[in-house]
Structures are given as structure tokens and as C-alpha cells.
From Swiss-Prot:
Keyword Metal-binding carried by entry: yes
The organism of origin for this protein: Homo sapiens
Tissues of expression: Retina.
Location of the protein in the cell: Cytoplasm
Keyword Glycosyltransferase (UniProt): no
Quaternary assembly: Interacts with CACNA1C (via C-terminal CDB motif) in a calcium-dependent manner. Interacts with STXBP1. Interacts with MYO6.
Name of the featured protein: Calcium-binding protein 5
This protein's encoding gene: CABP5
Amino acid sequence: MQFPMGPACIFLRKGIAEKQRERPLGQDEIEELREAFLEFDKDRDGFISCKDLGNLMRTMGYMPTEMELIELGQQIRMNLGGRVDFDDFVELMTPKLLAETAGMIGVQEMRDAFKEFDTNGDGEITLVELQQAMQRLLGERLTPREISEVVREADVNGDGTVDFEEFVKMMSR
């Protein structure tokens, strides 16, 4: 199932991407990276794990291939002790941010879309919230079975709801 999303906020347009690859990131881009990083730094120790990096990259709108994730994982394990701090994350992501083209979803757009579904603001999308959002946002009335199927596909941890990370994965398919 596809959900309509807004335009990208931090990725460069095709015409200027080549010229801009060597420029430093702007303050707004660094803040975008910081927001994304903090979303995945659950214990607030200033680090994210190697395994969370792929999900974090997807949150930012970058869709790494399996090979890229394997290579990054090896680099992180060898050079960074299996964990990435914010500075290392910026260093890893800067070339990707500068090289990507328009049409990708940024963290804020993803978070805004999630909030449209999570109407009570508790950080989880329930069956009822999904059904209401589909009707309100897309004009689609899904059956309870169809709603359950959407949640089941997205609900990685099996708790019956869709949290932000699961939402990002669902939107990345």
C-alpha cells in the first residue's frame, strides 16, 4: 500500500548536485541529521548501533542497498567499534546527502506523515487510527481485515501497533 508523501526537504536537485558535492553541509542539514540521529539514539548515550544505521538512513530518505549496508557495517565495525556517534554519522552521511537528488522524503516529512496517522500522539498507530486516517487522508474505507493486514505487515515487533521506526520501514517498501 502506498501513502502520499510530501517533497524532500534536504536533498539537492539534479542540476546542482554535481557542483555541490564538495560543499559543507548547511546548518539546516546538520539539524536534520541531528533529529534523525536522536530518533534512533534510544538510550541517549550519544551512539547508535551498526544495525540501526540502515533504518536511520531510510528515515532520512536514503534507500541503501544491501551491499552498501554490508560495506558500511564492515567499516563501522572495523573503524568505529560497532557504534556510531553523531560526528561519525555526519561524516558517513554527508556524501550521500550531497549526492542525492530531489523526490526523497526527509525526517520532518516522515515525522509529519506519522503524526497524521498517530492522532492521539502516543507514538503508535493503532488499527482504529489507521482506519480513520485512511478514510480522512485518502478517502478510502478499508475493511477491518484490510486494516489488520496493513498493520500486520508493518508491525515488526508484533505488539499490534506501528511505531515510528516500523512506519519508516513500511514507507520505504
